[in-house]
């Protein structure tokens, strides 16, 4: 069972100009640390004061065109290029300074936006205009799903069931991450019952239990009108139930019709969330729990329609454990909708994961993503990078969760479009370079005769 509920989001009808300003503010999301502000200033817009949109002394000389075509190109020079050029420069500068950029083909580009406008040619300008429209359409469609600050308002946007894996070494803040996801309203709908599964109940310190109870209550409320607080679920205080792994895998808990099924009892009240922590050793044994990842959620929802949310979070310390006798971890990876990864994970495991899930992206964008992981592993603590297999929007397929700034889309789809534009510009310039070389050789031969 997989469904998407209605989005309780603010519809934001941003224009292209507003989106351009918003994107301009975010242009330095990932750049060379030695020159963080070198590309942040916008390129000055050329002054086109004549009626045709081009000054009389403009360096842009085009063949005679129909009025409609001429206006389109004038608009392109005045609007689209001013939007695209700083982003193209930023991406090219970033890629050229990547530690792993030795294998990348260097891309040729124009020196300035004026050179691009004057020398690109009609064909390239039309391609730039077409890709600009695709890019703006993508940004406009993502805007209603984001907060005014540009953050994601939910991890799953009512996608059900939510099966997620949290990868992180000891001390990376996995338990704090799970509490923050619940207390910051990033799980939709908010669970009314949370099952905390550990190998042994006595291994949970009292301070952690107090933190869980406090943040569950915090996540159950939101601001209402006239400085009031309103519960987000059908209960005033969500329940926290601790279970051992053996209790989780008890036979009666697989049968939704069994009167002792603890999950069925909770599903009668509302949404539930199951968190499996510190159980990687038990997951690798013979007993299968794969039903909790695919068959069990649909049966539970069919029998208890009031259970509108079913979330499972499984914590792993190793992205590729060797011991998986029952296939639990392999099945979990297949069924998982979200892979929440700490940049502190072993680099070779992170690289293997990225190579597996970015095959449709250009190699340069894959290297950029690896460098983002490497940068955050060395400079920032308690941040996370999330891969979503079923994103609400393509810009949210890869997301970045910062302790202070919240959950942000990484816009790798936009970076892919920009990189493809750089490749088109490079192709045109290299073709002209070959033509000039061939023409020079021909002239030399004629001169020698």
Swiss-Prot record:
Region (DNA-binding): 437-449
Keywords, alphabetical: Activator, ATP-binding, DNA-binding, Host nucleus, Nucleotide-binding, Phosphoprotein, Transcription, Transcription regulation, Viral genome packaging, Viral release from host cell, Virion
Regions of compositional bias (Polar residues) in chain numbering: 35-59
Biased composition (Basic and acidic residues): 11-25
Xref: InterPro entries: Adeno_IVa2, P-loop_NTPase
Inducing stimuli: Expressed in the intermediate phase of the viral replicative cycle.
Self-association and partners: Homodimer. Part of a genome packaging complex composed of packaging proteins 1, 2 and 3; this complex specifically binds to the packaging sequence on the left end of viral genomic DNA and performs packaging of the viral genome. Interacts with protein 33K.
UniProt keyword annotation of Magnesium present: no
Function: Component of the packaging machinery which encapsidates the viral DNA into preformed capsids and transcriptional activator of the viral major late promoter (MLP). Binds, along with packaging proteins 2 and 3, to the specific packaging sequence on the left end of viral genomic DNA and displays ATPase activity thereby providing the power stroke of the packaging machinery. The activity of packaging protein IVa2 is stimulated by protein 33K which acts as a terminase. May be the protein that pumps DNA into the capsid powered by ATP hydrolysis.
UniProt-recorded Gene Ontology molecular function terms: ATP binding; DNA binding
Keyword Phosphoprotein recorded: yes
A Pfam entry, by short name: Adeno_IVa2
A GO CC term attached to the entry: host cell nucleoplasm
Compositionally skewed regions (Basic residues) per UniProt: 1-10
Binding positions (ATP): 168-175
Name of the protein in question: Packaging protein 1
Annotated spans, Disordered: 1-64
GO biological-process terms attached to the record: DNA-templated transcription; nuclear capsid assembly; regulation of DNA-templated transcription; viral DNA genome packaging via site-specific sequence recognition; viral release from host cell; viral transcription
Compartments reported by the entry: Virion; Host nucleus, Host nucleoplasm; Host nucleus, Host nucleolus
Similarity comment: family membership: Belongs to the adenoviridae packaging protein 1 family.
Organism classification: Viruses, Varidnaviria, Bamfordvirae, Preplasmiviricota, Tectiliviricetes
């Amino acid at each position: 069972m997989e469904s998407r509920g209605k989005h309780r989001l603010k519809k934001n009808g941003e224009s292209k100009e507003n989106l351009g300003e918003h994107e301009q503010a975010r242009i330095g999301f990932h750049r060379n640390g030695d020159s963080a502000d070198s590309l942040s200033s916008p390129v000055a817009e050329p002054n086109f004061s004549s009626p045709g949109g081009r000054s009389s002394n403009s360096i842009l000389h085009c063949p005679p065109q129909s009025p409609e075509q001429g206006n389109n190109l004038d608009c392109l020079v005045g609007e689209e290029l001013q939007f695209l050029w700083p982003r193209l420069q930023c991406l090219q500068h970033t890629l050229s300074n990547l530690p792993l950029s030795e294998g990348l083909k260097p891309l040729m580009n124009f020196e300035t936006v004026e050179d691009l406008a004057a020398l690109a040619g009609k064909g390239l300008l039309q391609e730039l205009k077409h890709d600009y429209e695709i890019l703006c359409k993508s940004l406009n469609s993502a805007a209603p799903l984001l907060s005014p600050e540009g953050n994601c308002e939910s991890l799953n946007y009512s996608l059900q069931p939510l099966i997620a894996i949290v990868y992180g070494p000891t001390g990376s803040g996995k338990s704090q991450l799970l509490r923050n996801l619940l207390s910051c309203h990033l799980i939709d709908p908010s669970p009314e019952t949370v099952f905390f599964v550990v190998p042994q109940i006595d291994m949970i310190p009292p301070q952690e239990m107090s933190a869980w109870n406090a943040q569950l209550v915090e996540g159950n409320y939101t601001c209402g009108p006239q400085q009031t607080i309103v519960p987000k679920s059908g209960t005033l205080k969500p329940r926290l139930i601790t279970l051992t792994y053996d209790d989780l895998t008890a036979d009666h808990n697989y049968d939704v019709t069994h009167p002792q099924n603890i999950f069925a009892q909770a599903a009668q009240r509302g949404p539930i969330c199951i968190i499996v922590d510190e159980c990687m050793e038990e997951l690798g044994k013979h007993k299968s729990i794969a039903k909790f990842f695919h068959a069990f959620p649909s049966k539970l929802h069919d029998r208890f329609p009031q259970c509108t949310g079913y979330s499972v979070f499984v914590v792993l310390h190793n992205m590729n454990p060797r011991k998986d006798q029952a296939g639990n971890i392999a099945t979990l990876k297949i069924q998982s909708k979200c892979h929440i990864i700490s940049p502190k994970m072993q680099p070779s495991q992170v690289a293997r994961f990225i190579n597996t899930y970015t095959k449709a992206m250009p190699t340069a964008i894959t290297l950029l993503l690896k460098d983002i992981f490497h940068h955050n592993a060395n400079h920032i603590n308690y941040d996370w990078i999330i891969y979503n297999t079923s994103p609400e929007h393509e810009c949210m397929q890869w997301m970045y969760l910062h302790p202070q700034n919240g959950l942000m889309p990484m816009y790798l789809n936009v970076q892919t479009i920009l990189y493809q534009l750089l490749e088109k510009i490079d192709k045109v310039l290299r073709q002209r370079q070959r033509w000039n070389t061939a023409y020079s050789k021909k002239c030399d031969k004629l001169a020698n005769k």
